[in-house]
Design a protein with these regions (language model features):
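Short, flexible active-site-adjacent loop segments at beta-strand->alpha-helix junctions, enriched
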Residues: 91, 132, 211
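AMP-binding/adenylate-forming
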Residues: 101-114, 125-185
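Nucleotide 5′-phosphate-binding alpha/beta core
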Residues: 1-86, 92-109, 113, 117
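Short helix-loop-beta connector
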Residues: 120-124
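Structural motif corresponding to the C-terminal cap of alpha-helices
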Residues: 115, 119, 190-191
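Active-site glycine/GP-rich loop and adjacent strand/helix microenvironment
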Residues: 1-12, 16-27, 33, 149-279
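A generic structural signal for short coil/turn motifs at secondary-structure boundaries
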Residues: 95-96, 135-136, 212-216
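Short low-complexity stretches enriched in small and charged residues
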Residues: 44, 52, 78-85, 129-135, ...
Length: 279
C-alpha cells in the first residue's frame, strides 16, 4: 500500500513537509542543546524558518559536528532511550544514536513501507542475512519493519553459507536481505555442493551496503555477475543511521523511493549549496 502523502503532487508534498519542518524546528529549540547553541550563534529566529527553502539560512550540520557534540544531540532524558545504535565509524569515531519508543515505531514504519515498495507482502517469508546485534541499526530496523508488515522472518545473521542454504531449503523464504557481494559466495557454495539454487524458493533480494545501479541507473558489474548466474530480482536500497530512513527500489528497478513523511532530502555540492536534478 502506497502512503497517501506519496501520491500527492509536488506542491501538496511541499506544504505537508513545510508544516512538519516548523514543528521540528520548534522541538529542537525546546529540547536540543546543540541546536539551541547553533541557532543562538547564527542568530536564527525560528519564526523565519517556515519552508524547506528557508533551511539555507542555517549552516549545514556535518558529521564532525555530531561526533564532537554527540551527547548534545539527545533531546530526551536518558531513561526514555530504549535502544542504542552506532554508525560504522568508517570515517572516524562511531556516532551514537539513542532511540526512544517513538523512534523505534518510526523505524518500523520506514522499513515496512520500504519492503512494500519492493513487493514484499503480508505473509511472505524473508531471510535476514545481516546482523541484528552489535549496535547495528539496520538489522533491527528490518526485523521491526517485517514484523509490522506481518511478514515472517528467518533470522540467520551474516555469513556462513552452509547455514544460509540450510535455512533456505528448510524454510523456503521468498526474499533475502543481504549484502549483494555475499550472494556470489552463496552461488559458489551452492555450485560446489550440488544445491539447485536456480530453482530455490528465493524470488528476490533486498540488497544493502553496496551499489547495484550506476549513475545512469544501469546495473553495476556486481549486479550483472549475480544475475548472470542467478535470475532473481535485486532491489537496491540506501540508508544511513543518521537518517534512520531508507530509499528502496520498487519493481521498476529505477532508483530508490523517497518517503516525504519521514525526511526532507536535500542534495548539495561541496560548498553545501543545493543542486538541481542530475547535477
Amino acid at each position: 500500500m502506497i502512503p497517501e502523502i506519496e501520491m500527492k503532487n509536488e506542491k501538496e508534498i511541499q506544504h505537508f513537509q513545510n508544516e512538519l519542518l516548523q514543528k521540528q524546528i520548534a522541538y529542537l529549540v525546546e529540547n536540543s542543546p546543540f541546536y539551541q547553541r547553533k541557532f543562538k550563534a547564527e542568530n536564527i529566529q525560528i519564526g523565519t524558518i517556515k519552508t524547506i527553502a528557508d533551511l539555507q539560512k542555517i549552516s549545514v550540520t556535518n558529521k564532525a559536528d555530531v561526533q564532537l557534540n554527540n551527547d548534545d544531540f539527545f533531546c530526551v532524558p536518558k531513561h526514555e532511550i530504549l535502544d542504542y545504535a552506532t554508525t560504522s565509524g568508517t570515517l572516524g569515531d562511531p556516532v551514537t544514536f539513542g532511540l526512544t519508543d517513538n523512534d523505534l515505531d518510526r523505524l518500523a514504519y520506514n522499513e515496512m513501507i520500504s519492503f512494500q515498495c519492493a513487493g514484499v507482502q503480508k505473509g511472505d517469508l524473508i531471510q535476514l542475512m545481516t546482523t541484528i546485534d552489535r549496535r547495528f541499526m539496520a538489522g533491527l530496523a528490518y526485523f521491526l519493519g517485517l514484523r509490522k508488515l506481518g511478514a515472517g522472518i528467518v533470522r540467520v545473521g551474516a555469513g556462513v553459507p552452509p547455514l544460509q542454504w540450510d535455512s533456505i531449503l528448510r524454510y523456503q523464504p521468498k526474499y533475502l536481505i543481504a549484502v549483494p557481494s555475499f550472494l556470489l559466495k552463496m552461488i559458489d557454495y551452492a555450485e560446489e555442493n550440488n544445491i539447485d539454487y536456480k530453482n530455490s524458493s528465493v524470488k528476490g533480494v533486498i540488497c544493502i551496503g553496496e551499489a547495484l545501479r550506476t549513475a545512469n541507473l544501469e546495473p553495476t558489474l556486481l549486479a550483472k555477475r549475480i544475475q548472470e548466474k542467478w535470475n532473481i530480482a535485486l532491489h537496491s536500497t540506501y540508508a544511513s543511521t543518521e537518517m534512520s530512513a531508507a530509499f528502496t527500489e520498487c519493481e521498476a528497478f529505477s532508483g530508490g523511493h523517497h518517503h516525504p513523511e519521514l525526511i526532507i532530502t536535500e542534495i548539495v555540492n561541496e560548498q553545501n549549496e543545493p543542486v538541481a536534478d542530475g547535477e
